[in-house]
Curated annotation (Swiss-Prot):
Taxonomic lineage of the native organism: Eukaryota, Metazoa, Chordata, Craniata, Vertebrata
MF-aspect GO terms: serine-type endopeptidase activity; toxin activity
Active-site residue numbers: 65, 110, 203
Database matches in InterPro entries: Peptidase_S1_PA, Peptidase_S1_PA_chymotrypsin, Peptidase_S1A, Trypsin_dom, TRYPSIN_HIS, TRYPSIN_SER
Gene behind the chain: TLF3
One family name in Pfam for this protein: Trypsin
Disulfide bridge positions per record: 31-163, 50-66, 98-255, 142-209, 174-188, 199-224
Protein function: Snake venom serine protease that may act in the hemostasis system of the prey.
The protein, known as: Snake venom serine protease 3
């Protein structure tokens, strides 16, 4: 019930405190209740909101810029007004960042690994999503999902998570249209004609390509889902060694350069 009250307040407030670079799903539809079992909600009472991905019973992967004070983590949520009987709440026990990941100039290190204070129980609405076994291919159809705004620039927020299909594009397109630096650890995805994409509130959520967890929502254009403004995603495959080392207890592991 605490989550329901907080999310309802967030929807009423229209996320007035939404963090810089947070993004939403535009042009999508309500996610099937069973297709977002790994999607988690990160929020606090001040109105900050992000998504994340459960990668095993104790760990969540999200964007570094989603870090917030007094973070609460909820799993198994589908409706802000109608709770599931298997929703679970957790607090962050530990947070791990890549070196300089809180520096906005480090585009390719916007990644945060969160250890939960208690293990999560798998259920009908909760299950982890494995790390990718191989990198994605340009042209792949990818699924985005989140609680972000569904209209832009005048933002409205849904009662349920929204999902949409987009395509993985050549990174060179994001360099041109988003004026991004020449980074190899960023994925570029979207619909060049516009109409579908991430928006405020979806930051930290997953990009799932051909069933594999390939990206973490980083950001997009100032107005969401515009033509020639594809979204930017952290390339999860490049960080699998760092993630696995941290989970194994090697907390001094360094990120790829």
């Amino acid at each position: 019930m605490v989550l329901i009250r907080v999310l309802a307040n967030l929807l009423i407030l229209q996320l007035s405190y939404a963090q810089k670079s947070s993004e939403l799903v535009i042009g999508g539809d309500e996610c099937n209740i069973n297709e977002h079992r790994s999607l988690v909600v990160l929020f606090n009472s001040s109105g900050a909101l992000c998504g994340g991905t459960l990668i095993n019973q104790e760990w969540v992967l999200t964007a570094a810029h989603c870090d917030m004070p007094n973070m609460q983590i909820y799993l198994g949520v589908h409706s802000a007004s109608v709770p599931n009987d298997d929703e679970q709440a957790r607090d962050p026990e530990e947070k791990y960042f890549c070196l300089s990941s809180n520096n906005d100039t480090e585009w390719d290190k916007d990644i945060m690994l969160i250890r939960l204070n208690r293990s999560v129980r798998n259920s009908k609405h909760i299950a982890p999503l494995s790390l990718p076994s191989s990198p994605p291919s340009v042209g792949s159809v990818c699924r985005i999902m989140g609680w972000g705004a569904i209209t832009s620039p005048n933002e409205t927020y849904p009662d349920v998570p929204y999902c949409a299909n987009i395509k993985l594009l050549r990174y060179s397109l994001c360099r041109v249209y988003q004026r991004m630096p020449a980074q190899s650890r960023i994925l570029c995805a979207g619909i060049l004609q516009g109409g579908k994409g991430i928006c405020k509130g979806d930051s930290g959520g997953p990009l799932i390509c051909n069933g594999q967890f390939q990206g973490i929502v980083h950001g997009g254009g100032k107005t969401c889902a515009q033509p020639y403004e594809p979204g930017l995603y952290i390339k999860v495959f490049d960080y699998t060694d760092w993630i696995q080392n941290i989970i194994a207890g090697n907390t001094t592991a360094t990120c790829p350069p």
